Regions:
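PLP-dependent class I/II
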Residues: 1-170
C-alpha cells in the first residue's frame, strides 16, 4: 500500500488502530506510521481505549499526525463535543502507564469466545463465514433467500433465544 501511495502525494492515510492490543497470541501489531516512515507527513493514526482496555462508551481517544492538522482537528472537536469526564481521563492515564497484563488476559478471553462463536456458526450449513482475526466479532454471510440482517436477528431472538446484533449497526 505504501508503495502505491508514494505515487499519489494528494492522498492521506488515516490508520484506525483501535484493536492494537487485541491480538492473537504471537501476533505483533504494526502501525502504518512505523512501517511507512516516508509517508509520515501524510499519515494520521487514530486510537483509543475502548477496545484494548474495555473502556467502551467512555469516549477517550487520540489522533497523532502532522501538527497543523492535529491543531485544526482539535479546534473542530472542541466545538462539536464536550470534554472527556475526569474519571475516564484518569482511567486512560492508568492504562497508558500501567501493566498490559489485563489487556493480554482480555484478548485471550475474547479470542476464546470468538472461536466458540465461529465454530458454532460454521456448524450451520446455510451460513458461510470467514474466520475473523484481530477482532472479537463475526460476520456470517446469510443465504440470498434469508431475510435481511435485522429481521434475521429478530427471528433468532424470538425463535431460538439468541441475541445478536446486525452488522448494519457498525
Amino acid at each position: 500500500i505504501a508503495e502505491i501511495l508514494c505515487r499519489h502525494p494528494q492522498v492521506f492515510v488515516m490508520s484506525d488502530e483501535i484493536y492494537e492490543f487485541l491480538l492473537e497470541e504471537g501476533e505483533i501489531h504494526h502501525s502504518f506510521a512505523a512501517i511507512a516512515p516516508d509517508l509520515a507527513d501524510r499519515t494520521f493514526t487514530v486510537n483509543g481505549f475502548a477496545k484494548g482496555w474495555a473502556m467502551t462508551g467512555w469516549r477517550v481517544g487520540y489522533l497523532s499526525g502532522k501538527r497543523e492538522i492535529i491543531q485544526a482537528a482539535s479546534a473542530l472537536q472542541s466545538h462539536s463535543t464536550s470534554n472527556v469526564c475526569s474519571f475516564a481521563q484518569r482511567g486512560a492515564l492508568a492504562a497508558l502507564n500501567g501493566s498490559r497484563d489485563c489487556v493480554i488476559s482480555m484478548a485471550k478471553s475474547y479470542n476464546h469466545r470468538r472461536n466458540i462463536l465461529t465454530k458454532g456458526l460454521q456448524g450451520i450449513e446455510a451460513l458461510s463465514i470467514v474466520e475473523p482475526t484481530g477482532a472479537f466479532y463475526a460476520f456470517p454471510r446469510l443465504p440470498q433467500t434469508s431475510p435481511k440482517s435485522l429481521k434475521f436477528c429478530e427471528i433468532a431472538l424470538d425463535q431460538v433465544g439468541l441475541a445478536i446484533v446486525p452488522g448494519l449497526a457498525f
